[in-house]
């Protein structure tokens, strides 16, 4: 699926089309990833059901807050995006426009993601199982957390799944048009299959969400990523006895993806895989376009570190892979 300025819509369509054309006239190359980010902002702003384009402080804060729990680079990009659009609207004479202050935009250069140990992941699963035994609302999280760790999928990818995307005949999940416009197939084992059958909307229509929002009915709404991320930080981690702070940054549910990728790579090497062969396989599993993106993405445990680094250097020297992973995760 190709995303262009023709995809902009609603009362903000003129704003976004004009913004892209203005930036391009200055020599900026607006590729797919930038347009996709603006389209997400367009979709968010249209939820306010306005008659004319405005940008209030509450709207800007809400846009940024919905990404709480995601990578600092994602939040940084969202803050920069909402500020730039606000500046453009202000300069074009739109009324009631809030410009997000530059001083509030976070610097992410010193960020290092958190890697959960196997023991910590076991504590997380135990914690959510206890919570689920006390309250039915946590049943979804029993499946969601196991799905995230078993597949290294992104939270948004799991919540975007439709009933037709989970094939219980072949035990394969299809992730459609994810980040970098990549579609991929992810196999799952019998253990995860049981959880998917228990926690998913297996009786829904093919185009229904596999994890629909509570009381969604026929509205077609899915669960909100923000709600999942916040509950993980504020409820599940404390219940598991894990400090939510990793230095000056909070541990995020997205760190399960990092941890899963590291565990997969370590396991493949333990099975005797050549690291050179393992990295491309893992890159495909994660939905990356290039091997370099996978190497940068992983924060490896000490086991096999030298082997992986040497393999990565070999790959770069051979000129394989493209560093085309989006800045925001």
Model segments located where?
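Conserved catalytic core of the tyrosine transesterase superfamily
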Residues: 1-329
